[in-house]
Amino acid sequence: MRKYLLIHILVISFALLSAPVILAEEEPAITLRSSYSDLSLLSVQSMHNISIRKKDEWGFYGHSTIIHRYEKRSINGDGVVIDHATGLMWHPSGSSDYMRWNNTNNWIRSLNYKGYAGYKDWRLPTLDEAVSLLESSRKNGGPYIDPVFDGEQWGIWTGDIHGSRGVWSVYFSLGNVRWNVKNRYIRPVRSLK
């Protein structure tokens, strides 16, 4: 009888102590800004969840401080990467060609029309979301991004602008963030909620 009571108490204790951990897994630990904005250089250099190695007049060199929990998954035959730490679902590669920023809407619209991975709410990431992918070091001699993602996209557009001067981009090839007007790739994202 004592043995049964002890086991019963241990099982109940485990269940009660595990409840907060299970709930924490369901909710993202970090919520990143998901609406586009006109960002100044100072506001970009003051972003949360980053470590800056060097600031310059175009942006900064640095990396995310977020501890990611990536899960690679196939949905309807389409690959996705889910980040349980931020509650974001990423396209694992994105566009195979780089393009001007004013052409990104057509590419995203086509992806949504096809219903990639069963969803029609894909978009360009905000700078906060895109910079969250920057790693502190090159991975396997490749870019500054986790190898769960395709490393071909060396620089990606965001939906955030820098006044009339340009658009904010993240460069996985150099581990930096900067504004520009040249051609970049697209790595679409969607919020899980």
What are these model-predicted stretches?
Residues 1-9:
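Bacterial N-terminal signal peptides that target proteins for export
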Residues 8-18:
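Bacterial N-terminal signal peptides
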Residues 20-123, 127-193:
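Glycine-aromatic-enriched surface loops/turns that form tight recognition elements
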